[in-house]
Amino acid sequence: MWAENSVFYQIYPLGFCGAPKENDGVTVNRIGKIADWADHIQRLGADAVYLSPIFESDRHGYDTRDYRKIDCRLGTNEDFAKVCETLHAHGIRVVLDGVFNHVGRGFWAFKDVQEKKWDSPYKDWFHIHFDGNSNYNDGFWYEGWEGHFELVKLNLRNPAVVDYL
């Protein structure tokens, strides 16, 4: 496998590109900064870039809102495609870090559960108990990853969740 013989250069794009700590909803092409470093990465002998989470998130990237678009604080999917083209032109592969065992509280299916409670078709996407309350006063209790309630654990035994991912 190619990865076994590769030299990786890891980047945490939200920090590297100077994105705001909180998602303000404003789209700014900051991810292009990575393309500016392609020559440097190549000179170091790295032939792969490992990008920490770039998907739309509430704050730090590990609290995903949308797996289908990059964080607006980094730009658009088209901006990211251009970065990939530049890196590929330098012989550098791109590997994404995706978090698929939990999402952020801003994830669309969790927002639906917050609004509709028992009536949400997505209530079984998470480990939810309607006989308790969360630290955020949601009117139900749910499992947070490692006890962090801003990171809502997905129910990976649910085939609909697996199909979505």
Regions found by a protein language model. Give the residues of each.
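Acidic/aromatic-lined carbohydrate-recognition and catalytic surfaces
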Residues: 1-164
